[in-house]
Structures are given as structure tokens and as C-alpha cells.
Amino acid sequence: MLWAIVLLGYLLFVVEWFVIDRIAGKPAGILDSNTKVLPNYDGWVNSFFANSAGSIAGSATNWSITLLRAVGSVLCGIVVLKFGYRYAVMIMMGLMCLCFPFLIIGDPLGGNNQLTLLRPLSKEVMGKLSSLSSQLHEGQLLGPVMAEGKTMLADGQTIDLVQGLDKNLIGTSSSIAGYALFIIFRSTIAIGGTTLVTYSQPLIASLSTQRRKSVLSNANLWGFNSGIVVAFVPFLFQSVQQAGTKYWVFILTALILIGFGILCVFAWFEKQMDPFMPQKQTKEQMQLGNQPSAGDILKRKATWKMIGMYGICLVVLVNPLTGGWWNILQAVSPASSFNVKDGVKTLKPLEGAGGYFAGLPTLAILWVLGYGMGYMVFSPFNKTVYDRKRWLSFMFFMNALMVIVIVLFAATLGVGTAVGFAFVAIATFIGGSFAWSMQSTILILPHEFKEYKRSEVSVLFGYIWGFGYVIYTAFDITNSMFLEAPKLANPGMKGVSILPGAIAGVALFAGLLLAAIAIVVTLPSSYLKNGDELVSEMTKKWKLNQWQFLVASKEKNRYADLLK
């Protein structure tokens, strides 16, 4: 029951994390006397930005959150030792609820929020927008206005707009400060939510059998994957996208209240934890060394090998869910596969929904649903007595291969054609099956290494997730710099191709996956364990043609000896 509640809290975090981006809306733009169509001011981005801040600044949202997820994950192990398991979970769930000020910061509040760009239209400024006169009325919320050589807010206040890296005028110093505060409070969702999946591991470690540990470790992944599906499926439809951006404050308020409800349910049902669960440390216990030392765990070589391997695993899991990956696929696609209007690419087979709305969510959903196939075909390996190194080497290689296959389909057929998008979608689904099932194998390893006791698992997973997200953040920063470099080299020019940066990003992506194999071969051996007692080492070597574990059963099956 407690495991399900903790996993539900993690699922809610994933939904919040991705839904916020889906209902962001568009920058406010700058109105002038020639503007004939009034912009749509739904969503929260227009509160802070007049124009796009570019790939690097735009990705800063993701960087800051993944870095703070790293901080939260590292701290979670320390928190559970300091306060005990029950209060650690409640603290982190409470932290998710403390994000609510970002709702106030991002809402124009009827034009009274000095941290946003939207203001009530004054009669004087309305007279300067003659081409929009039939669409305007006094007091209407509008974004910045350019008139008579001056930039002003809709209430007539003269302002200076800050230039972005690509020379666009992006916002005022106040709105950019507001955006920084928005990100800081939003990040509490990430800090608290990330730790919940870490806190599910002590519950798994307390189970009596390796098989049950394997089942729940695999099931843990459905928390993230289900959250992705819930966050992306509604936005396949443009009507939902429009409604979501219009009512973004109400949607996010509801999600925060649901999170508070989950916190209350956990506090109500929580009972005395199993003695094996991490408990609060007293000074005497620290001195006697009865409880694990977070510092000692971090010093172990196996910990850093797990961090490096899992960091690269996070790259392959998260990158295909980002706009940066979608931009790469569009950049390598033939120009003939798109309709281009006013410099905006639209997928031909999905014009009704628009390239961004339908393309990225569709591939993201297929990517996470790929785990369904992986769960049946690849994850059963976790129940075997095979040594893990060859298997993980094979999985990292296959992930690198699928990245290359997806890019080749996009480059030759184009994601803007029905056939090309279909092939990319199929390859994405297959690639997801390899990636997510590989993660399930990685997450079972700490339960099989002799280096770690059950009481140390929560601390170890905190380090794995924490420093792993540092690795992912470094990749995300580098990738966004690759994509932005062609534009920075040609400031002020429109329609600059990001193809060179896209190629560099793909090379980095696939190269990291192949480099992970060098870490895998140095991993410690896995053991069958009874609690913290070592039963036997898993020495049986897996070969490429050995897939009998798919049909192995403990009940009178000739392959039963393959199972734990």
C-alpha cells in the first residue's frame, strides 16, 4: 500500500513536470501600428517574454530543474537518515506542494503583477494601434507595444527590452526576474518529486525474494511512463492544447491540491516501518557506526560506476522527450517534407494539429509505451542468474544503434511525410523498449551487489539519481549549445539552418551510449542474496542466442535453472 502511494506521488510529479511545458503558450510579441492580428495571451510564457529567448536560454528551464533534481536526490538519502523514512517522505511530498507561489508569479493578476509584461490597455496607447482598433477596448490585457520609436507596456509605461543571445528583444529586467522566481518555485516540484521514486527503493529492498524485488523494480518505471502518457496524450488535440493554455492556473492548482491529498493519505496510512527500513540516526548510532554513512557510500568505486552508467541511461531516457530532439529530427529531414509558412515548419500529414503539437507528443508517447514491449521481451532477464555485464553491454549498443536508425529514417524520408513519420515512430517505439527495460536492469543492480546493504539502498539511489541528473544536465547544456551555435554565428539572420549542430548532437548522443559499455565491463559481480547475506555469485554468462528466459518457469520447466 505504501509503495503504491509513494509511486502515485511520483506519477503526479511527472505529470506536473511535463504539463507545465505543454501549457506554456507563446511569447507575447510586440504590437505596433502595422499589427493586424491580436496575439493569443493564453499560457504563462507571455507573462515573461516578448520573443523567444533562443535554444540556450529556453533550455535553461530544463537545466535548472534537472540540476535541482540532482540536489534533491543527493539530499534525500541524508534526509531519511536524519528524520527517518516516514518524515522524509512527508517532507518531500510537502516540498512539492510548496511550489504554489509560481502560480501567482506567472499570472498577470489583471495587469497588477509587476513581474509580468501584460498590462491593461490605456486609452492613449490604444490610439497608437489603429490597425487593431476594432479588436481592442480600454482595460484589455496586452503585451508590449512599439510606437513612435518607443517601447512601452500597454498601460503607457516606457520600458527598455533586454536583448537575448540571438539579438531578439526578449523582455524587461523585471519580467526576466519574474521568470527566475517562477523557475525557482517550480523547481520545488522537481526536488520533492524526484526523491519519491528513490524512497520506493527501501520498500523494495525489504521484500523477501529476488523475484518480488525484480517485479516491483520493473513496476516502478510505470510511474514515470504513465505520467508521460497522461501529460502528452491530451495535447495531441489542438482544442485541448488551447483550453490547457487558457486555464493553466486552474489546471496546475488542481494538480497541487491532488499532491496535498496524496500527502495526507500517506500520513494517514503510514504505519511502523520494517526494521530494515532506514530509521532516524541518533548521535550514539552515528558514533557506533550502526547506520550507513552517506560519505562512506559515496567513496566506493561501485557507487561512481553506477552514477556514470545511470547518468548516460538518463540521457537516452529523457532526451527523446525534449523539444531539442524534435528539433534535431526536423533539422536533418529533407526540406521537401514540410510546408513552410512565415518561416514556420508544419508537418504535412499532421497539419490539423500543427507540427509541434502532434509530432513531439506522438513520438514521446510511443517512446514511453515502448516499455510495454520491453517489459515482456527484455525485462524478464532481471529474474535470471545470468551475469549482468554482457546483457547491459548489448542493451547500450542497441540503444546507440536505434538512435542512429531513427535519425537515418528522418534524414532520408523526413518526419514531415506520412511514410517518414511512420518509420520514425516505429523505430522510436522499438528504441523505447530497449531503453526503458535497460533501466529496469540497472535499477536492480544495487540489490544484487555485495557492496551495499539494504539499509544503504536509499542513500545509494539518492546519489545515482542526483549525480546522474548532473550528467544529463551537462549533456542538455552541450546539446542546446550545438543547436544554437549556427544562429549565434549568424546573428540577426532568419532561417539559419541548425543542421551542423544537429549532427554534432546526434554524434554526442550515440557516442555516450557506446562509451557506457566501458563502464559496464568494470562493474562488480552480482549475487543472489538473502537479506544482506550473500547466497551465491551470478557467474553464468549470457550469450546473444540465449533467450530461453522468456519462457522459463519455476514450475517443472526445463529452463527453470536460469531463474533466481
UniProtKB/Swiss-Prot annotation:
SUPFAM superfamilies: MFS general substrate transporter. InterPro entries: MFS_Mycoplasma (IPR011699), MFS_trans_sf (IPR036259). Belongs to the major facilitator superfamily. It is found in: Cell membrane. It holds the Pfam family MFS_Mycoplasma. It is a multi-pass membrane protein. This is Major facilitator superfamily transporter MPN_076. GO terms for cellular component: plasma membrane. The chain crosses the membrane at residues 1-21, 65-85, 89-109, 176-196, 220-240, 249-269, 306-326, 358-378, 404-424, 425-445, 457-477, 501-521. Its main location: membrane. The keyword Membrane applies. Keywords: Cell membrane, Membrane, Transmembrane, Transmembrane helix, Transport.
